[in-house]
Amino acid sequence: MNANSPPIAPAQPMHFEDLILEQGDLISKKLHLLSMQQFPPNAKKLLRQFSLSEVAQFLGVSQSTLKKLHLEGKGPLPQTSSSGRRSYSAEQMAELRQYLDQHGRSEARNYVPHRRSGEKLQVIAVVNFKGGSGKTTTAAHLAQYMALTGHRVLAVDLDPQASLSSLHGFQPELDMSPSLYEALRYDDQRRSISEIIQPTNFPGLDIVPANLELQEYEYDTPLAMSNKSSNDGKTFFTRISRALSEVNDRYDVVVIDCPPQLGYLTITALTAATSVLITIHPQMLDVMSMGQFLLMLGGILKPIRDVGAAVNLEWYRYLITRYEPTDGPQAQMVGFMQTLFHQFVLKNQMLKSTAVSDAGITKQTLYEVDKSQMTRSTYERAMDSLNAVNAEIVELVHASWGRKVVS
């Protein structure tokens, strides 16, 4: 350095909050660019065709029955490939269901499984305190499976991160679709939930999308509780159940994707729930975390019960997610859970699969991805796992209605 050169000023340290704001902005912009390339804002999410075997499984009939209907000119006309393979759209599958319900009904089976007189709206809260448990993946595939099997379903995204909404074609950073907060808020701007519900690309499945605005409920509720001139805050735990009562007749099942923390949103969802599904990754740290979650949850719900807001459930279950059966420690942890909780653990597990994670890259579920886009064995193994889990949950829902399980 030249002796006459001016001294170089030391670099100013960057404040942590400035650094994370800069990096958060960078991530958002890059992800937004990728999202725009894969799913432009004016794009509409479409749904693939379903193969004959898939349609037969979702309808609960044999493939030969569907072939016979086609040959007799009954029901919607399937799309036929150059190789002669038949496939149906989800809308056509719904038409087939209606046709079978009218012309193929037996005492053993109703092809349209809508609620009957005296059967209660089923509200399934999907919860976990720890991220990475497959909570949103579970909620999305369950809601879609129930719609594909003929139920009228409302999915409610209560997680401000809005992953469930993204999987259904909503882009919270662009769409600004109203969230459930609009039906929960304590001021005179509260709206009916019917104004917030949006259709999805799955016939029979609607959604209440999420956005960061939901976080406002966590701040508003303590203020409302301290307001001596109103009782609204003191009965905050009734707000979701009251909102859902406005659309009670429109749906058979509501699937709520709860946020991954024990805040007012989660508590309000649990007091509205008729059943709870706790997702758990079978690793020691995850199970330990879940144990703490259960202790905290029980401690919070007890005083709420004492003021008349008991959580009255038809059922609750633990679902093992992202399971690798060949992993010895995971298999041991599954055995540990089954020994401890017996019938409270679902018999079927959601297997870890690259098929599910690969679909997530393009903001799709496995029910949206075409088999030809993946290794066939990987796809089928993941699909069999998902269908087995979801079918078991549907049986629990139907049992809550007092229906006999039809194999």
Swiss-Prot record:
Keyword Ion transport among record annotations: no
GO-annotated biological processes: DNA replication; regulation of DNA-templated transcription
GO molecular function: DNA binding
Classification via Pfam families: AAA_31, MerR_1
Entry-linked Gene3D superfamilies: 1.10.1660.10, P-loop containing nucleotide triphosphate hydrolases
Coiled coil regions, renumbered to chain: none
Domain of life (superkingdom): Bacteria
Annotated family: Belongs to the ParA family.
Protein name, per record: Putative replication protein A
Lineage, opening ranks: Bacteria, Pseudomonadati, Pseudomonadota, Alphaproteobacteria, Hyphomicrobiales
